[in-house]
Amino acid sequence: MSLAIAVFAVIIGLVIGYVSISAKMKSSQEAAELMLLNAEQEATNLRGQAEREADLLVNEAKRESKSLKKEALLEAKEEARKYREEVDAEFKSERQELKQIESRLTERATSLDRKDDNLTSKEQTLEQKEQSISDRAKNLDAREEQLEEVERQKEAELERIGALSQAEARDIILAQTEENLTREIASRIREAEQEVKERSDKMAKDILVQAMQRIAGEYVAESTNSTVHLPDDTMKGRIIGREGRNIRTFESLTGVDVIIDDTPEVVTLSGFDPIRREIARMTMEMLLKDGRIHPARIEELVEKNRQEIDNKIREYGEAAAYEIGAPNLHPDLMKIMGRLQFRTSYGQNVLRHSIEVAKLAGIMASELGENAALARRAGFLHDIGKAIDHEVEGSHVEIGMELARKYKEPPVVVNTIASHHGDVEAESVIAVIVAAADALSAARPGARSESLESYIKRLHDLEEIANGFEGVQTSFALQAGREIRIMVNPGKIKDDKVTILAHKVRKKIENNLDYPGNIKVTVIRELRAVDYAK
């Protein structure tokens, strides 16, 4: 009984446990299903959010892609535009170059046509001359036959009359024939000489005309004054300085006369030496720009500009040598030639004159079949002696010959320099050509001025007289030659000798120069003591 009860109790417990477990399992299943639903909902939400974010990213990427594409397109267009501009510029440059080449070819073709025409004309002239000579030869042959016939007739006549022997008759006839032929030949020689002279004169004129037409001569009249513009008239007082110290220092150091008058905002620098005048002009302009105008600054700038002018002289010479096609000229000769930029001959700039002579000589030499490069070189150097003739004794021809020999120029160049004024005989065609080119350049209307050259020579002679006295360091002709200012060596000339020197200079000027009015002689003795504090 109790066992049954126990078994029943166990069964009841099992049933209850099963029911309890079933209820729990059902509850857990419902919870699981709920969680599954929640998870699915969350997944759906996350997927929607992800899809939205993905859409946003896609849209953003599309916008960025469009922006990048637009920028790339703009950059490509800009690159294309730049490339097109470069191509256009290159094409334009090439087209311009082609035009220049075409122009040069056209000019060369025209020149060749002219030469061809000249050669054709000369050939025709020679053919005519040859025909004329042939005709004359035939005439002479016919005349000779006639003379022989006359001889035979005379011989027969003489033999007929029997007064003379055959040998004597022959001698008489030969003498008469020789006399007749001599007159005929002399007449024909004179005619031929006259014809050759006329033709040679015409050819020479043609060559000179061609040379003159191909030279674009330029000429700027040389002056003895340079004008410097001032910012205002108050600068005139500063230029003069206290008690005239600045202007006296400026004139003493540069050798140029400073003219300050009523002309507004202008100072005039007057001097016959172009190098001194250029140094003075540069110094004055630098003083005005700098604003510091006092004797020490003036001295500093004058020395600086002297060095600058020396560099300019070399540049002028090199540029001129390259212009006439002589770049292999010795550097020292180039520098000496550069000094001619600041020299004049009868008012004509000597460097420009030398370049013009070189070009004319080259053209004429080319027309005559001579060495054009050598002719240009000889023409360029023919007046080189004028660059230093005021420093070295002798004429500019002698000095030029010495320079040419010193720097081993060809003998043709040396002889050209020596003979271009007819001092010695020309030994080559080039020497004659250069002499003709020199005369042609000098004779060109407006190229030279006798009055200016005479004035400059008078000032130069005035300075030479002063420099000839012992103890004189340098001298400057000022006031258009109305004053000579002499700087003496204080170690050689004492104070009591200054007045005597001025008197001697005055007497020599009176005895050796012709001049209008009076000339003031000023002798300056300046003693400087310089030391340095350390």
Swiss-Prot record:
Residues 350-443 form the HD domain. SMART domains: HDc, KH. Its EC number is 3.1.-.-. Belongs to the RNase Y family. Keywords: Cell membrane, Endonuclease, Hydrolase, Membrane, Nuclease, RNA-binding, Transmembrane, Transmembrane helix. Its main location: membrane. This is Ribonuclease Y. It is found in: Cell membrane. Disulfide bonds: none annotated. GO terms for molecular function: RNA binding; RNA endonuclease activity. Residues 109-141 are annotated as: Disordered. GO terms for cellular component: plasma membrane. NCBIfam families: HDIG, PRK00106.1, RNase_Y. One of its GO terms (biological process) is mRNA catabolic process. Residues 224-287 form the KH domain. It comes from the Bacteria.
